[in-house]
């Protein structure tokens, strides 16, 4: 009985071991590939639990999401013969799930060693071999990342379609200590030069600001002077216009006054011309004679009252006053 129990226990253990080896789990972001007898099977599996034939089938989980591969301590010889070392180069990449089978078949599940690590060494040495230390360490260092990315992706597009390089990050290389000190001194001098140049620019900027300020002040003074001059000109023009208006008004008044006097004189003359008729003049003459207390003697005295036309030709008689002695003498025929 004990022998049969032992056999049963062994059988249960074998079945449990078979089930344990048959059930496996694939994590999210991974693709499972299977090997049977060392041969890669065409079937792949996604995330979750899966079954496989125990003992004769094995699997590997291949990451298909974004991952970062680090390539460390990469030697690089420049065109000048200086050996430098890049401490760390990071390659960010991801694998398209549909391309997992082909890439694993051609480059195994550790495809990154062949397609990324070795390729980084090759491309970086190619870059260093055609550039000197100054270019690699300073002038072209900012281009190394992009150049490596483009070179890797170009080769992968033909060798392993489906493997995508997202980014490449390269650290500053280590150079010999003596050269590094020289570069530090050079950078220090360059920094001093830049500081001096910046100070010079600041001084020039301040001078330019002062010059512009002076120009603005001068323009301001000129504009104020121009405005004042314009005001004076306008005042003079206003005074001139006022004077012209006053002169015009005075001329108009004088002309109106002269016209009025002329009109009055003309009307007076017309009235006199109409008034001084021969009859009126005769009446005035009679009135003057009647009002005159003087006595005129002469042969033409009667004619004064008989012939008005002889008025201008009448000879003047001897004028005697009322109190003259001749008036008191008797006439010759009175005796």
From Swiss-Prot:
Cytoplasmic side stretches: 1-2
Compartment annotation: Endoplasmic reticulum membrane
Membrane topology, Lumenal segments: 24-335
GO BP terms, alphabetized: cholesterol metabolic process
Pfam families: Band_7 (PF01145)
Superkingdom to which the source organism belongs: Eukaryota
SMART domains hit by this protein: PHB (SM00244)
Keyword Endoplasmic reticulum tagged: yes
Keyword DNA-binding: no
Ranges annotated as biased composition (Polar residues): 310-321
Cellular component, GO, one term: endoplasmic reticulum membrane
InterPro entries noted in UniProt: Band_7, Band_7/SPFH_dom_sf, Erlin1/2
Carbohydrate-modified residues: 106
Residues passing through the membrane, by range: 3-23
Keyword annotations of the record: Cholesterol metabolism, Endoplasmic reticulum, Glycoprotein, Lipid metabolism, Membrane, Signal-anchor, Steroid metabolism, Sterol metabolism, Transmembrane, Transmembrane helix
One example GO MF annotation: ubiquitin protein ligase binding
Topology of this chain in the membrane: Single-pass type II membrane protein
Chief location: endoplasmic reticulum
Residue numbers spanned by region Disordered: 310-335
Described purpose of this protein according to its UniProt entry: Mediates the endoplasmic reticulum-associated degradation (ERAD) of inositol 1,4,5-trisphosphate receptors (IP3Rs). Promotes sterol-accelerated ERAD of HMGCR. Involved in regulation of cellular cholesterol homeostasis by regulation the SREBP signaling pathway.
Family membership noted in the UniProt record: Belongs to the band 7/mec-2 family.
PANTHER family with a match to the protein in the record: ERLIN (ER LIPID RAFT ASSOCIATED PROTEIN) HOMOLOG (PTHR15351), ERLIN-2 (PTHR15351:SF4)
Protein name: Erlin-2
